[in-house]
Regions:
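Solvent-exposed, polar/charged alpha-helical surfaces in well-ordered, non-transmembrane soluble domains
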Residues: 48, 52, 56, 71, ...
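Flexible hinge/capping segments at coil-to-helix
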Residues: 128-145
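Short, low-complexity disordered leader/linker segments with a strong preference
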Residues: 1-27, 346
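Short helix-initiation/N-cap motifs at beta->coil->alpha
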Residues: 64-79, 89-91, 168-184
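Pocket-lining segment of extracytoplasmic ligand-binding domains
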Residues: 132, 144, 150-289
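An extracytoplasmic/periplasmic, membrane-proximal ligand-sensing/linker region
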Residues: 24-52, 212-248, 283-346
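Alpha-to-beta junction loops
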Residues: 79-88, 103, 143-145, 187-196
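A structural signal for short loop-to-beta-strand junctions that line the ligand-binding cleft
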Residues: 104-119, 267-273
């Protein structure tokens, strides 16, 4: 009997070890968590393509998993057993960090931050119809606000705080479901203003080659819109093309690229920006195997630098990442303090 019990115990332990060792295999794949912040179908299909590429590069089995909303993504992190990484928005990552720490007593890791248009931060843009008569942030008082969903950093959390701090009371709210859907609602006149992500206009290639780029304090639509006389500039309308073109890189870009609303710049403008928000990036749950984490990080860095990878990551209907940059979780500490999050002990 003792011999049977001993053999049974050995078998159970062996199976446990084998199960742990098989993380990253078809039987137990790593899960790449995605959030539905832009075009849900595009995010899902692009995430699948990225997961397949990372599997090919690393030899680890990786499957993309589209969560229905931010709370579901956070739950995936806090309940994971060292087998989850993801591309979470800033607010989603910070909430996942807190919940995971509460549940496990351990901290998530944040080794890569995204780069968009040369920046590792972004802003909330307050967008309005140009014919609305809304010209300043203060003019938003009493107006109907369209936002993506409550878990969105730039779409809801930051603007909600800024509107409240400024004493602005909106005349109503509409939850649209995504940044793109918010823009559609504004374009159709269903809301008076929206809050959505803003990345600065991209300078012409000849200026970029000289190191020039948009800086905070510059015209919010530099090279894109001329208010006197009112007209659009840039590649979007064909007014200026080639090496002298400026490019729209904010929430309106996707609608220009797919031709859905070719007059979106003529119809929709920006009246204000939020304070800067650190970009989203690549995060891992606690206890993710160190060697596999390093392999995945290296694979993302190499893949996004290829034409195939860059086309996937930079798609404005995905997450519009031009590149990634090494970082640590500490990059969020100033933002944590500004938004009332506790700075973790490390």
């Amino acid at each position: 009997m003792r011999r049977i019990l001993a053999l049974t115990l050995i078998a159970v332990l062996a199976l446990s070890v084998i199960g742990f060792a098989q993380a990253g295999t078809k039987a137990n794949p790593y899960r790449l968590i995605l959030v539905p912040s832009t075009d849900v179908a595009v995010v899902a299909s692009t995430g699948d393509a990225i997961a397949e590429a990372l599997t090919r590069i690393t030899g680890l089995e990786i499957q993309a998993f589209m969560t229905p909303d931010i709370p579901a993504a956070i739950s995936e992190y806090s309940s994971a057993e060292g087998d989850v990484f993801g591309f979470l928005s800033t607010a989603a990552y910070l909430d996942a960090f807190v919940e995971t720490l509460d549940v496990t007593g351990k901290q998530c890791d944040f080794p890569l931050i995204s780069v968009r248009n040369g920046y590792i931060g972004y802003w909330t843009g307050y967008y309005v119809r140009r014919d609305s008569g809304i010209e300043t942030f203060a003019d938003l008082d009493g107006k109907v606000w369209g936002y993506p969903y409550p878990g969105s950093t730039s779409g809801y959390k930051v603007p909600a705080a800024e509107l409240a701090n400024a004493g602005i009371t909106v005349g109503g709210t509409v939850e649209t479901g995504s940044h793109n859907a918010s823009l559609v609602a504004l374009y159709n006149g269903d809301v008076d203003f929206i809050s959505a992500f803003f990345s600065p206009p991209q300078a012409p290639i000849v200026l970029r080659q000289m190191g020039f780029q948009w800086e905070p304090g510059d015209d919010l639509e530099l090279g894109i819109w001329n208010s006197t006389p009112a007209e659009t500039w840039g590649e979007a309308t064909g007014r200026i093309t080639g090496d002298l073109a400026w490019y729209v890189k904010d929430v309106r870009e996707a609608f220009l690229l797919d031709g859905t609303y070719p007059d979106v710049v003529e119809k929709i403008g920006i009246v204000a920006l939020s304070s800067v928000i650190p970009n989203d990036g690549v995060s891992f749950v606690p206890d993710f195997p160190a060697a596999d984490k390093a392999a995945i990080v290296a694979a993302i860095k190499s893949f996004i630098a290829t034409p195939e990878g860059n086309a996937l990551f930079s798609n404005p209907n995905f997450y519009a990442w031009d590149n990634v940059q090494d970082t640590t979780d500490a990059i969020y500490d100033v933002y944590r303090q500004a938004k009332g999050y506790a700075v973790p002990e490390r």
